[in-house]
Amino acid sequence: MPVNNLTNEMPWNLTETVAPSVEPITTVEAKLHLRVDHGDEDAYIDTLVAAARQYIELVTRRSLVNTTFTLKLDAYPTEIRPPRSPLSSVTSITYVDTDGNTQTEASSVYNVDTDTEPGRISLAFNQSWSDTREQNNAVVVTFVAGYGAAASNIPAALREVVKMLTAHYYEFRQPVISGTIATKIPMHIESLIWMHRVLEAP
């Protein structure tokens, strides 16, 4: 029996399986914004750009560049809302059937709505989800989220925020830990980031 709400009714786990192939801004773009004209810190600047992207993605619940995720659920909800936006595509939905075997749900069973934010995966007309075994992580949704494979597809406002946050990290050099930095982010940058937060999370 499907449940109505993914977050409130069941636990879920999200894992990044394929990282973005590019960062939102290049090393050259970052150095131009920072007014750095030497190459001694290129690797360090690249690390700061990645950290800025990761923080922005965490707060906004977005993926700036196409990234592949797996979403694990204990059962099928009535509607699946992948917890990263914008939803680009659904690669597959697999499930553990009542005999304990892993099966792939036919794509004809569900519709993928990439226009709504967050995106939605819902049953097609006159279809139903397959029966699953009662166990943890019985349903696995593999999907791609992001504005595209190229940085040029990212909205200009978000690219500018990446530059601003990278500049803040560069000016206040603190250890980079899991995409975050210890120094408090200025209010104007934080406000710009929160403006892009997906309001309705799954």
Q: Which residue stretches match the model-derived regions?
A:
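Divalent metal-cofactor coordination and adjacent catalytic microenvironments
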Residues: M1-P202
